[in-house]
Amino acid sequence: MSKIKLIVGLANPGADYAQTRHNAGAWYVDLLAQRHQQSLKEESKFFGYTARINLNGNDVRLLVPTTFMNLSGKAVLAMANFYRIQPDEILVAHDELDLPPGVVKMKLGGGNGGHNGLKDIQSKFSNNPNFYRLRIGIGHPGDKNKVVGFVLGKPPTSEQKLIDDAIDEALACTDILMRDGYEKAINRLHSFKA
């Protein structure tokens, strides 16, 4: 496994979207920065908020794009090109409709599951899907016609607590990923349910 050099939290920009389910990836990156006594600062050349942390002796960049979700690839590509980071050295945290709140999974590669942020990142990397994904469960509204309103809605307190607990576990597993590797990280992460 390549070492992770860039961790991205997908989100829509602005206060109107800050607490919506679609911003779960940004919640994870914000908390990761806080736990390492860093704050994300806007950096226009990367079209997002960035920070730099040390994860178990590894120099890691953090990025929360300020583009809208469907243009996330622009920010990821800008930072990856500038720091010469390969797709398999990137972990993208995002909301996942196919997992319930309180569950989080990690994987390398795969499809985009209809997620516009992932879709745009893949297209910017010449349709290379081989980057890591941290899939933060937000649940599904049960009807595909209600998905847009659902992901752009704020979760009720009970669901928010489950999502927050899953993000806490994901943070612990990020340390394991960097220290002990992918297999150990997913063994722990995939057995967790808030």
Curated annotation (Swiss-Prot):
The active site is at H22. Its EC number is 3.1.1.29. TRNA binds at Y17, F68, N70, N116. It is found in: Cytoplasm. GO terms for biological process: protein quality control for misfolded or incompletely synthesized proteins; rescue of stalled ribosome. It holds the Pfam family Pept_tRNA_hydro. One of its GO terms (cellular component) is cytoplasm. It catalyses: an N-acyl-L-alpha-aminoacyl-tRNA + H2O = an N-acyl-L-amino acid + a tRNA + H(+). The record marks N12 as: Discriminates between blocked and unblocked aminoacyl-tRNA. Hydrolyzes ribosome-free peptidyl-tRNAs (with 1 or more amino acids incorporated), which drop off the ribosome during protein synthesis, or as a result of ribosome stalling. Belongs to the PTH family. Monomer. This is Peptidyl-tRNA hydrolase. It comes from Proteus mirabilis (strain HI4320).
